[in-house]
């Protein structure tokens, strides 16, 4: 399609369905970032094959959208930051970036907890950097429907004496944040830690398997588990 008209002024505030809106519009590349998307529920295949489109749409309010399948399928030019999108209502993300060859943005803040289908979401998205793969994996892999194993690209904050206790405290106050920052506690690399004194003091609910920890350099471990209740896994 040769369509490339300026439609930035359209009032779409009451539109609920934008499925296939620009499908096959290979010439379209107009600024539509100010559109009011707050009522949209379905945007599957919206930019399917819109191979020229690369305008900012990161400020769109997509919090009501439940279906985002194929949105950027073969949108080969698109590479705009959409990491602030609220996708917490979405259940379908399959083929979303399939062959979106230029896309290389962080989606680490996306809440994909309700997503039931992420099949081939990034297949042939050859522009996606290893660092962004790692960040995406950290955020998405908690969903059992995540189809990729990008664990090799994941990097976590190193754990040392300076932040070990902070990491432990964060695990108990915000497990999801702790996992995103340091990884799951069972997998922590504590080989640089020398002082674990009172680390789990009074943490009566703690029962994670940390038997794989490398504590070879620990010189202070007194009162590590002091608590009214003994831990089962040490």
Task: Describe every region a protein language model picked out.
Residues 1-227:
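Negatively charged
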Residues 228-234:
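A short, hydrophobic C-terminal helix/tail in secreted or cell-surface proteins
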């Amino acid at each position: 399609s040769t369509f490339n008209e300026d439609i930035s002024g359209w009032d779409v505030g009451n539109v609920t369905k934008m499925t296939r809106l620009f499908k096959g519009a290979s010439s379209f590349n107009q600024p539509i970032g100010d559109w009011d998307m707050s009522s949209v529920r379905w945007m599957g295949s919206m930019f399917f094959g819109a191979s020229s489109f690369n305008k900012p749409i990161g400020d769109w309010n997509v919090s009501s959208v439940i279906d985002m399948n194929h949105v950027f399928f073969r949108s080969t030019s698109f590479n705009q930051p959409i990491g602030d999108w609220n996708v917490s209502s979405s259940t379908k993300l399959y083929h979303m970036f399939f062959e979106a060859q230029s896309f290389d943005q962080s989606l680490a803040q996306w809440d994909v907890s309700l997503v039931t289908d992420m099949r081939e979401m990034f297949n042939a998205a050859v522009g996606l950097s290893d660092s962004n793969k790692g960040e995406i994996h950290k955020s998405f892999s908690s969903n059992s429907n995540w189809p990729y194993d990008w664990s090799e690209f994941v990097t976590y904050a190193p754990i040392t004496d300076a932040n070990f206790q902070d990491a432990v405290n964060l695990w108990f106050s915000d497990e999801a944040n702790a996992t995103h920052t340091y990884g799951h506690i069972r997998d922590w690399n504590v080989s640089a830690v020398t002082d674990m004194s009172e680390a789990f003091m009074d943490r009566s609910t703690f029962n994670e398997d940390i038997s794989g920890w490398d504590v070879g350099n620990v010189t202070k471990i007194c009162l590590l588990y002091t608590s009214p209740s003994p831990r089962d896994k040490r």
